């Protein structure tokens, strides 16, 4: 029935595409795909071929030249011409797609193309443009999660997508009621890279029929591939624009080409404004009647970030101007259609009265302004506008200025940029999973709070009540006690926004004193300086002391083995920024104290918590909160905001302004109580399927196992959210399940996962199990604190001279092994148990326990290799050599293994697969622990 249901859906899709003008073709294998491609190449290049279609040898040369490339190189080739040497030694210039006149391509659709490479697979629906498979659609019946279609495509990408299938640009996955699209890649693709399509009003187009009508309409899909994908030349991967990015770029292009008016794009922080602005700049710079596109940024710390991003999208597409003289030189160069510079340098260039500037007075110049809500642009806009008489200005902002939050000169964003051309609000981005929501908690930090007038509280920024030693220490202790809950045991990092530089120094010194007293072992850093881009009006209490900053930098140098001081502040800034982005355990900043720096324009997926002891409102509040809400893995459900001031009113007001709604629930997470109720409801589903962990083993039917996996996965997802709250306690009274019972269920869940993984590796056939494409989200189960290194450290601590202490430590390690979720530790668990029970009790007091363990491990490894070799009638010596080679180089010589098996083909192939699997598992199990 499942097959029939999906088959019927497949036919609906084919019929609809046919109605939209696609030619339905019967292509069901690679040979037919090649024949069709050859026919279309001949058709599209009829004039160039002069009545002489490609010969077999010519087509073979063409296929040799364009086949076997990576996804990235195939994407580059698709967008370039190809020079084919004909049999008569003349050159033939071929192109594979009309990138400018999108409708003038040939559109075909087929289904059930069967590919047999390492494994046999059949693809649901394939869209061919000019004979190349550019869009692959994978369908699931209603009620099945589309992540299963995603996982199936991932399997195909690993096993079968070779040859012309490397030209696939976009994947579409759907279960009829929910549909998403995403770009192909040579890399691992994450589920967060699947996008919803929507209309201009940001209303999702989920229903497959509507999606096909809008997104897969032939001219649109061709335009999407031609115009709204970016081939990232630095990191070598494809990017597809999201719908709101497409609409924003189109709105800017229409405004620039059809009017002389300005406009701004309001896209929430974290939604990819840099990519949108790059694509708009790139397309505008290709227009003949536009003399120059100038991208203006505000601060030096953003210059390098924007430049790096732009040059990632297209290598060497921009050359940043680091001084006004260089800017003038670039303005004079007609071969540079796109320039990135600062507002300040452009203002200086205008003031210079240079002859180059005169030549631009009457020309059509486009200015694109990043973070256009900032006040500096308003100040310099008049000067620039007076000079460039025919310029147009397009601004990008996540937090525009309105009447409620207008700038100091009394102007709103619309006063400068006229009209909002497209908006994508924070509530839209959260709904689409493009950014995370916020979990906000408020902590009272002085007893007399309720007795103070609210207006008075807002005015006492640096008075004694906020800077009191007792209050500062209480906040530090509260933060320390909850740090691991908030940051997922240190897998993420945090920022602490405070009111002033004196407060930052006081907090820093308090954290350091508490660290010296043994209260915590967190790495705390701070960064501040007026010269490094703190706005003067936001820094009235500026008391910067170079000596204090040098002292703080010296602590930093001691911690991270660096060598910074105030003379090379930029190096310090870069290092801090890098450690906040590339979180490496034991080499990261746990808490970064800031005043204004890093609260705008700084992106880090590894930052998940913001502590706040600072008065924030309107755009400043949303900008600061948004540092935490970049999407990462499943273990980051939202951005944590911990306020040590009562910012409830300001938070609600800011959300209402920037979401254009009075419903803050669209942005804020549920309460602890609501998550707890959800947890208990899901727990009942788990109990119904398997009343005890042992009952999981009785679930023989795969459909029941699948139900258990989905229910327990949802339970774990909710548990991660609960664990971030201060009030969380893992007790049976609180949650309805004891922690050990939960761990036992988790063990059963991971057993099912490992069974499926083993089955996939050995069998590798499509549709072997309904569990094959389930999204297990094993990331949810991870506890980084209990891994092989941690257990080996505990083994090293066993006291062999005290039998009681020795057995207590053995018992402790046994308990930890029972709740192991680290993959390598689960592989080693039985080995370690055996060592603890059989070897440790017999060790002498002066034995080196670590040496004893590795000696035991080597013997067990040899036993396993010999036993497996005997079982498979394979040479133990050859198997041992293969294991050692794989351990050393990561390579397995499949051919050599096969040559040493005297069996018929199918048996030899299966045995080879089993031996390779054993080699991989053995190296993973006995591998060296870093």
Curated annotation (Swiss-Prot):
It holds the Pfam family T1R_D3-like. It catalyses: Endonucleolytic cleavage of DNA to give random double-stranded fragments with terminal 5'-phosphates, ATP is simultaneously hydrolyzed. SUPFAM superfamilies: P-loop containing nucleoside triphosphate hydrolases (SSF52540). InterPro entries: Helicase_ATP-bd, HsdR_RecA-like_helicase_dom_2, P-loop_NTPase, Restrct_endonuc_type1_HsdR_N, Restrct_endonuc_typeI_HsdR, SWI2_SNF2, Type-I_R_enzyme_R_subunit, TypeI_RM_Rsu_C. The keyword Nuclease applies. It comes from the Bacteria. The keyword Nuclease applies. PROSITE patterns: HELICASE_ATP_BIND_1. Its EC number is 3.1.21.3. Keywords: ATP-binding, DNA-binding, Endonuclease, Hydrolase, Nuclease, Nucleotide-binding, Restriction system. It is an enzyme of class 3 (hydrolase). One of its GO terms (molecular function) is type I site-specific deoxyribonuclease activity. GO terms for biological process: DNA restriction-modification system. The restriction (R) subunit of a type I restriction enzyme that may recognize 5'-GAGN(7)TAC-3' and cleaves a random distance away. Subunit R is required for both nuclease and ATPase activities, but not for modification. After locating a non-methylated recognition site, the enzyme complex serves as a molecular motor that translocates DNA in an ATP-dependent manner until a collision occurs that triggers cleavage. NCBIfam families: hsdR. The type I restriction/modification system is composed of three polypeptides R, M and S. Type I restriction and modification enzymes are complex, multifunctional systems which require ATP, S-adenosyl methionine and magnesium as cofactors and, in addition to their endonucleolytic and methylase activities, are potent DNA-dependent ATPases. This is Type I restriction enzyme SepRPIP endonuclease subunit. It comes from Staphylococcus epidermidis (strain ATCC 35984 / DSM 28319 / BCRC 17069 / CCUG 31568 / BM 3577 / RP62A).
């Amino acid at each position: 029935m499942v097959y029939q249901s999906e088959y019927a859906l497949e036919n609906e899709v084919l019929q609809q595409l046919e109605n939209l003008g696609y030619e339905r073709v019967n292509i069901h294998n690679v040979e037919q795909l090649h024949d069709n491609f050859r026919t279309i190449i001949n058709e599209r290049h009829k004039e160039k071929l002069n009545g002489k279609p490609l010969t077999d040898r010519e087509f073979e040369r063409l296929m040799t030249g364009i086949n076997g490339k990576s996804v990235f190189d195939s994407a580059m080739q698709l967008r370039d011409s190809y020079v084919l040497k004909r049999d008569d030694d003349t050159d033939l210039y071929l192109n594979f797609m009309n990138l400018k006149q999108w409708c003038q391509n040939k559109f075909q659709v087929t289904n059930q193309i069967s590919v047999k490479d390492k494994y046999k697979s059949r693809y649901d629906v394939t869209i061919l443009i000019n004979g190349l498979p550019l869009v692959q659609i994978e369908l699931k019946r209603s009620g099945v999660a589309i992540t299963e279609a995603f996982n199936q495509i991932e399997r195909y990408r690993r096993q079968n997508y070779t040859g012309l299938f490397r030209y696939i640009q976009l994947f579409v996955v759907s279960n009829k009621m929910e549909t998403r699209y995403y770009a192909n890649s040579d890399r691992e693709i994450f589920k967060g890279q699947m996008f919803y399509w929507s209309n201009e009003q940001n209303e999702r187009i989920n229903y497959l029929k509507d999606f096909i009508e809008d997104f897969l309409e032939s001219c649109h899909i061709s335009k999407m591939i031609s115009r709204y994908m970016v081939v990232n030349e630095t990191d070598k991967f494809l990017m597809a624009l999201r719908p709101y990015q497409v609409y924003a770029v189109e709105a800017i292009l229409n405004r620039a080409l059809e009017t002389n008016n300005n406009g701004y794009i309001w896209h929430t922080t974290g939604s990819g404004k840099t990519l949108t602005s790059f694509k708009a700049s790139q397309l505008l710079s290709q227009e003949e009647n536009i003399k120059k596109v100038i991208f203006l940024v505000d601060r030096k710390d953003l210059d390098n970030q924007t430049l790096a991003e732009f040059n990632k999208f297209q290598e060497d597409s921009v050359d940043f101007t680091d001084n006004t003289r260089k800017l003038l030189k670039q303005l004079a160069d007609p071969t540079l259609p796109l320039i990135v510079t600062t507002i300040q340098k452009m203002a200086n260039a205008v003031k210079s009265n240079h002859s180059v500037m005169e030549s631009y007075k009457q020309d059509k110049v486009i200015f694109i302004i990043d973070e256009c809500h900032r006040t500096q642009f308003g100040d310099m806009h008049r000067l620039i506008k007076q000079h460039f008489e025919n310029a147009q200005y397009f601004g990008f902002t996540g937090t525009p200025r309105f009447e409620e939050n207008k700038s100091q000169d009394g102007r709103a964003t619309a006063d400068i940029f006229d009209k909002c051309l497209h908006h994508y609000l924070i509530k839209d981005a959260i709904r689409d999973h493009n950014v995370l929501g916020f979990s906000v908690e408020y902590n009272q930090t002085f007893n007399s709070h309720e007795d103070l007038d609210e207006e008075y509280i807002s005015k006492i920024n640096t008075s004694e009540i906020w800077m009191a030693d007792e209050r500062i220490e209480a906040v530090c202790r509260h933060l320390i006690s909850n740090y691991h809950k908030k940051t997922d045991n240190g897998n993420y990092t945090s920022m602490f926004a405070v009111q002033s530089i004196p407060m930052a120094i006081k907090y820093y010194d308090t954290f350091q004193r508490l660290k010296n007293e043994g209260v915590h072992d967190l790495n705390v850093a701070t960064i501040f300086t007026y010269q490094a881009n703190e706005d003067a009006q936001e820094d009235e209490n500026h008391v910067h002391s170079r000596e204090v900053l040098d002292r703080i930098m010296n602590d930093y140098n001691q911690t991270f083995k660096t060598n910074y001081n105030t003379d090379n502040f930029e190096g310090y800034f870069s290092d801090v920024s890098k450690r906040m982005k590339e979180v490496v355990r034991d080499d990261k900043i746990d808490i970064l104290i800031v005043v204004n720096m890093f609260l705008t324009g700084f992106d880090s997926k590894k930052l998940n918590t913001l502590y706040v002891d600072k008065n924030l409102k309107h755009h400043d509040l949303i900008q600061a909160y948004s540092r935490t809400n970049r999407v990462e893995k499943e273990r980051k459900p939202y951005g944590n905001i911990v306020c040590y001031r009562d910012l409830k009113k300001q938070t609600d007001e800011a959300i209402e302004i920037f979401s254009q709604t009075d419903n803050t629930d669209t942005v804020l997470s549920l309460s602890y109580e609501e998550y707890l109720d959800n947890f208990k409801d899901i727990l009942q589903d788990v109990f119904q399927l398997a009343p005890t962990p042992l009952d999981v083993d009785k679930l023989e039917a795969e459909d029941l196992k699948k139900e258990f996996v989905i229910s327990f996965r949802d339970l774990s997802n909710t548990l991660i959210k609960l664990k971030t709250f201060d009030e969380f306690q893992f007790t049976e009274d609180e949650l309805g399940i004891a922690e050990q019972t939960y761990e036992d269920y988790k063990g059963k869940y991971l057993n099912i996962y490992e069974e499926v993984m083993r089955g996939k590796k050995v069998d590798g056939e499509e549709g072997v199990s309904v569990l094959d494409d389930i999204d297990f989200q094993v990331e949810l189960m991870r506890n980084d604190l209990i891994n092989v290194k941690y257990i080996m450290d505990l083994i090293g601590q066993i006291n062999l001279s005290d039998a009681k202490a020795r057995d207590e430590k053995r018992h402790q390690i046994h308990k930890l092994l029972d709740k192991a979720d680290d993959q390598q530790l689960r592989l080693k668990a039985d080995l370690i148990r055996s060592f603890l029970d059989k070897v440790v009790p017999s060790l002498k007091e002066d034995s080196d326990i670590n040496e004893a363990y590795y000696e035991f491990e080597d013997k067990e490894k040899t036993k396993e290799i010999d036993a497996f070799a005997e079982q498979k009638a394979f040479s133990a010596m050859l198997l041992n050599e293969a294991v050692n080679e794989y351990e050393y180089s990561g390579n397995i010589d499949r051919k050599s293994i096969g040559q040493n098996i005297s069996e018929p083909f199918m048996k030899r192939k299966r045995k080879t697969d089993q031996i390779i699997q054993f080699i991989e598992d053995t190296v993973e199990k006995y591998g060296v622990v870093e």
